[in-house]
């Protein structure tokens, strides 16, 4: 099949999307947004939303054009997300574009939230500015930028990425529970980068018991640490756990069952943890209820790191959006499988994972798939 034919606007979308990616991990619960301003086929200003509370991409692009000495009146604006029309931590971007006198605004992705949807384009059109959607390929790419934002807007729940590291025979630990390390150093470093891009990182009681993890993103450069979530079904978490060593910079959220005694939860709250109680008749239902509570905490994306019981509940819930599986060149035998739970009775009832992407990471192989798009 021949490659997609390049379009004249393609390079501008390439740049806007690249700029938007710079904000990943810092803007939530706001979406990542990039913007370029173009005149006569040349970029005269560009910007992106750096972090929550900072200038939005359109306003930064306008300021950048001015700083370069470029006139924006009559220019075309390419922005990955519909310009906002409400006042939050920043004034409306639609108003700024009207005041600047731009001639045209091309939008990569509509904003589905009630406070914004359609309002920014209406302000622009009422001011005589041409507004149009990007070409289909650019729309798809811009939507992929903000999958977490789109899912939480649609469902109130965070986008879920399930990460697993297993041996060639599908084991995540030996029969004694030893799992350090199945994946190689390159894979583990990649996971630290993913943590830095997510709002939250989660493990279950079993992983907490065996590893006492910190779940922080340990990479160079500026990092906004994710919230650390423990689905503490047994319950096992105590205030002396390693999680609490970084609580000032990385919040701790404990998801308890409705049967957990209140006296177990009081010390955790006193130590600074946020405690939410999930309800439901089975593990999958409790997982869904927990996602509702986490969404209320403005968590838009979450990396599930383990273990098999939590992975089984997540898959059974139907809430997993993406899967990242590291397969190491090891054969363990015995041990624990990557996903537990009841599972289907028939192979025909198994989950079909479409369009797997396979890439080498050090000595490991990374298999990636998107189960849902928003």
What does each of the following model-derived ranges do?
Residues 2-31, 89, 159-161, 166-374:
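Enzymes that bind and transform nitrogen-containing heteroaromatic metabolites
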């Amino acid at each position: 099949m021949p490659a997609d034919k390049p379009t004249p606007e393609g390079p501008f979308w390439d740049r806007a999307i690249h700029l938007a990616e710079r904000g990943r991990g810092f803007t939530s619960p706001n979406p990542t947004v990039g913007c370029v301003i173009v005149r006569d086929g040349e970029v005269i200003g560009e910007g992106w939303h750096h972090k929550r509370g900072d200038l939005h991409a359109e306003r930064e692009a306008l300021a950048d054009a001015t700083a370069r000495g470029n006139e924006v009146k009559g220019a075309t604006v390419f922005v990955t997300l519909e310009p906002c029309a409400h006042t939050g931590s920043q004034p409306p971007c639609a108003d700024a574009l009207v005041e600047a006198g731009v001639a045209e605004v091309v939008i990569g992705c509509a904003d589905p939230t009630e406070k914004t949807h359609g309002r920014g384009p209406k302000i622009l059109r009422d001011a005589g500015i041409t507004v149009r959607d990007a070409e289909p390929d650019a729309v798809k790419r811009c939507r992929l930028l903000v999958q977490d934002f789109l899912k939480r807007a649609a469902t109130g729940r965070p986008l879920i990425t399930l990460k697993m590291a297993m041996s060639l025979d599908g084991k995540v630990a030996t029969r004694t529970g030893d799992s350090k390390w199945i994946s190689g150093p390159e894979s583990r470093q990649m996971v630290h980068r993913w943590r830095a891009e997510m709002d939250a990182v989660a493990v279950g009681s079993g992983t907490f018991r065996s590893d006492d993890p910190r779940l922080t993103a340990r990479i160079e450069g500026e990092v906004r640490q994710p919230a650390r979530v423990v689905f503490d079904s047994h319950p096992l978490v105590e205030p002396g756990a390693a999680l609490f060593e970084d609580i000032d910079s990385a919040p701790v959220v404990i998801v308890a069952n409705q049967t957990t005694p209140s006296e177990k939860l009081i010390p955790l709250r006193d130590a600074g943890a946020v405690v939410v109680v999930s309800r439901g008749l089975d593990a999958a239902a409790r997982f869904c209820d927990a996602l509702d509570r986490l969404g209320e905490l403005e968590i838009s994306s979450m990396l599930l790191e383990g273990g098999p019981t939590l992975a089984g509940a997540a898959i059974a819930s139907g809430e997993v959006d993406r899967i990242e599986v590291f397969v190491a060149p090891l054969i363990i035998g015995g041990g624990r499988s990557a996903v537990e739970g009841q599972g289907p009775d028939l192979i025909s009832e198994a989950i079909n994972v479409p369009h797997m992407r396979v890439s080498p990471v050090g000595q490991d192989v990374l298999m990636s798939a998107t189960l849902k798009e928003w």
